Amino acid sequence: MVDKRESYTKEDLEASGRGELFGAGGPPLPAGNMLMMDRVVKMTEDGGTYGKGYVEAELDINPDLWFFGCHFIGDPVMPGCLGLDAMWQLVGFYLGWLGGEGKGRALGVGEVKFTGQVLPDAKKVTYRINFKRIIMRKLIMGVADGEVLVDGKVIYTATDLKVGLFKDTNAF
């Protein structure tokens, strides 16, 4: 049985990384430093821009986050690829929330634009994912548009984020 709530805590997301949230076959989130969110604040199956699902999640920012110490020394900024990865993570999390099974893999993105940055003095990053297409057959895949906001301002946009779930990733 899938744990299908509208919101999830950091502890819930960490449980997902251990394979405990969506069952043994469900897609886990990354663990440790690669988990790029502190909570999911909203999930709907029929919401969003396209009426096919919506996810909103948040990451609290503080100057002690691991990436600020190495990217870059003297010019700390959150790597843009981590924001992109967070959006892919949320697409896979949503597929698990719908009952999909398998290991999540990012399959691509149409276009990404960076128009701002996350600096150590920011307070919060918000991720918004609007699903365009969900396939739940032999192929399990989500296609979505996403945006990353820092303290309420949109700084990244991505179109056609694609994530698939695979039972066997050896040939991937």
Swiss-Prot record:
EC number: 4.2.1.59, 5.3.3.14
Gene3D superfamilies: Hotdog Thioesterase (3.10.129.10)
Keyword terms, alphabetized: Cytoplasm, Fatty acid biosynthesis, Fatty acid metabolism, Isomerase, Lipid biosynthesis, Lipid metabolism, Lyase
A Gene Ontology term for the protein's cellular component: cytoplasm
InterPro entries referenced in this protein's UniProt entry, alphabetically: FabA, FabA_FabZ, HotDog_dom_sf
GO terms for MF: (3R)-hydroxyacyl-[acyl-carrier-protein] dehydratase activity; trans-2-decenoyl-acyl-carrier-protein isomerase activity
Subunit structure of this chain's protein: Homodimer.
Function, as annotated: Necessary for the introduction of cis unsaturation into fatty acids. Catalyzes the dehydration of (3R)-3-hydroxydecanoyl-ACP to E-(2)-decenoyl-ACP and then its isomerization to Z-(3)-decenoyl-ACP. Can catalyze the dehydratase reaction for beta-hydroxyacyl-ACPs with saturated chain lengths up to 16:0, being most active on intermediate chain length.
PANTHER family to which the protein is assigned, alphabetical: 3-HYDROXYACYL-[ACYL-CARRIER-PROTEIN] DEHYDRATASE, 3-HYDROXYDECANOYL-[ACYL-CARRIER-PROTEIN] DEHYDRATASE
Protein name: 3-hydroxydecanoyl-[acyl-carrier-protein] dehydratase
